[in-house]
Amino acid sequence: MFRFLILPFIAFFLALIQAAVISEIMPNFVKPDLMMILITYLGASPLLITGAILVFFCGLLQETFSGSPHGLFLFVYLSIFFFIKLLGKFLILGEAITLRIVLVAVSLALQVFLLVLLPPALGILSNLSLPGLDWILPQALMTCGVGWPLFLLFKKLETLPGVEPSPLEP
C-alpha cells in the first residue's frame, strides 16, 4: 500500500521538476524526460493494475504541464507501458539497471515514433512542431544518464521497511 501512495507523489514531483526546474536550467535539446524513466520502471515492475493507473496519472500530469492536445501523452504513455509489459512476456526483464536503461532508450524511440505518427492521424499536425534528430539524440542520452540514479532510488524505495505489494496484484 505504501508503494501505491508514494509513487503518485514521485510522479507529481518528477513532472513538476521536469516542467518548472529543468526547463529553466537546461537548453531545450538536452532536457531529460523524467516521466519516461518512471513509466519504464512501472512497466518493468510486476505491478499491472496499479502500474496502469499510475501511468494514466503520469499521462494526465504530462498533458497538464506541457499543454499538448488532450489524450496524446496519455495514449503514448499507456502504449509504452503495455509494450514493456508485452516485452516482459517474451524477455526476462530482471533487476539489472543497465537493462532498464536500454528499456528507457527503446521507450524513447517508441515515443518519438508515436509522436511522429499520431498527430497526422489525429489531424493536429498543424499545431505541433516535430524536432529533428539533432534534438532527439542528446535528449535520449541525457534521459538515459539521469535514469541511472533514479533507478537506484526506485530500487532503494522497494527495500524500505513497510513496503508491501498491493493486494490487487497477484
Regions found by a protein language model. Name each.
Residues 1-170:
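Terminal, non-globular segments
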